[in-house]
Amino acid sequence: GVDINAIETTENREKFRLRMKELGVGVCEGSIATSFLEGKEIAQRIGFPLVIRPSYTLGGSGGGFVQKAEDFDAALNRGLHASPIHEVLVEQSILGWKEYELELLRDGAGNVIIICSIENFDPMGIHTGDSITVAPAMTLPDTVYQNMRDLAIKMMNGIGKFAGGCNVQFSVNPDSDEIIGIEINPRVSRSSALASKATGYPIAKIAAKLAIGYHLDELGNAITGSTTAYFEPTLDYVIVKIPRWNFDKFVGADRKLGLQMKSVGEVMGIGRNFQEALQKACQSLEIRRNGLGADGKELTKQEELLRSLENPSWNRLFHIYDAMKLGISMKTILSLTKIDKWFLLQIEELIELEKEIEKYEVGTIPASLMRTAKEKGYADRQIAHLLNCLESEVHKKRKEMGINRV
């Protein structure tokens, strides 16, 4: 299992930075502060905006981005108090960079496999537990992925020779493809649970057996029943995870998302494509939405939408859809959210499809259009809203067309 030195290296921010530099892995410029005065000196040297990351905390507790000098004192005090050893890392901000995760497993013989790549829909600046995530990564070029894979294995080997699971987080500059190591979790984590469900690979079970001395090639593959656990899963489907917040029960809570995790759970959608998985995840949230739009609950005030796009909250995904429907330009949405254009184009495609569906009635909609809508994750209730009819009528029409659930 994981040894104490690996935990010490990954949880102590300064030791992590120094070890990554020794391994040749890029890290953000920054330094450790154990007092208020040290933190002030580092901030003056690095400049704003910057990030405060307390040592030995979970869920990003006490951390945050600081845009202006006048907000720094309160943020630094908060971070120092959150850390049980009164220590924070003050580092340069990479707000807006793309964020990725890799799930790894290693045995005592040094065999390493990558179980899954995970891409954050939201850019750097939002805790990964509060970010919509997609598996496998959608916008990662193969050359960058191969570099990231090599770095992840180097990082895992560099923090100790333990056997078990490991989660490695990276940030990638969208303009230059520069890769920076954010953190390593040398354990089965929240992301491991997602990767396990997404791939069907029993990460926790295998990691436990590796920790007591088994090797990957000695363990059976529960899926095939004939091969070993020494393989890397390949997905022909897409997983979308959307966090679930419960701000209504916490009156007065700050709903803006940042480095400190605020979600209380999550849902997962599975589809043959990103759009289908996204719609299914939205339908599973239990927030009285039929999916991503097509339910008459769109926000139509431009000023509120622009403010929401710039200041991420739990409903920003829905507001991106609303902004596109209202005619706010792709350039503006891209500039305010820093979300990869590929994801935004996927949402734009859904809006164009809805416009096409609205041209018909339930009796005249072509079977090809109905099939396309279902393949992109639309529920019967959403299609009924677009056709201005009852859900039961859409269900009946779909059955007549021979379009059934799989």
What is the predicted function of each stretch?
Residues R53, I333, I383:
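Conserved hydrophobic/aromatic pocket- or pore-lining residues that grip, position, or stack substrates
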